[in-house]
């Protein structure tokens, strides 16, 4: 009897109906990341040099035509008052973001943490290993803290951010 890692699932995957979940990969982290690189809030596509890289997750799609649903939950705070945060999603070494969201911290006090959610749906386009990266930046000077406040962890590491990638048969 072959081991599970020796079984070729190619024929089985071809028989799945459209819309079936083929695989799910996930990373969740409570790790603290800090940085000071700004992300402008303007009408340009965020670049892979802006903000701070906070999380990455790799997937090897089973079919280039399949769809990928990428779901990001990102917790962060900033040392400045009233920052506008940008959360941007990148793939491999591509310079331009695939998707981005902005959120404004309307509380006048610095350091208030916010959770942001970004969802992106796309065609896989490859059957090679591909890595998705999340970068977060603010539009004002100061220090961004990912998963905490003022460079410190909160809630014992369970204030966690995540990336989940679901491959869906096309």
State the predicted function of each range.
Residues 1-38:
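Glycine-rich, low-complexity segments
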Residues 37-44, 61-170:
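Terminal beta-strand-rich extracellular "head" domains
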Residues 51-53:
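Short, solvent-exposed loop/turn segments enriched in Ser/Thr/Gly
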Residues 55-59:
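Extended, low-complexity regulatory regions
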């Amino acid at each position: 009897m072959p081991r599970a890692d020796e079984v070729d699932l190619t024929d089985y995957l071809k028989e799945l109906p459209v819309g079936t979940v083929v695989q799910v990969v996930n990373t969740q982290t409570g790790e603290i990341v800090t940085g000071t690189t700004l992300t402008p809030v303007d009408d340009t596509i965020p670049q892979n040099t802006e903000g701070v890289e906070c999380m990455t997750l790799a997937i090897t799609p089973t079919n280039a035509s399949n769809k990928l649903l990428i779901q990001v939950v990102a917790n962060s705070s900033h040392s400045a008052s009233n920052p506008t945060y940008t959360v941007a999603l990148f793939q491999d070494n591509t310079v331009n973001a695939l998707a981005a969201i902005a959120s404004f911290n309307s509380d006048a006090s610095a350091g208030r943490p916010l959770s942001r959610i970004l969802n992106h749906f796309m065609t896989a386009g490859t059957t090679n290993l591909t890595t998705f990266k999340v970068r977060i930046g603010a539009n004002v000077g100061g220090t961004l803290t990912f998963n905490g406040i003022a460079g410190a962890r909160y809630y014992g590491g369970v204030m966690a951010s995540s990336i989940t990638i679901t491959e869906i048969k096309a």
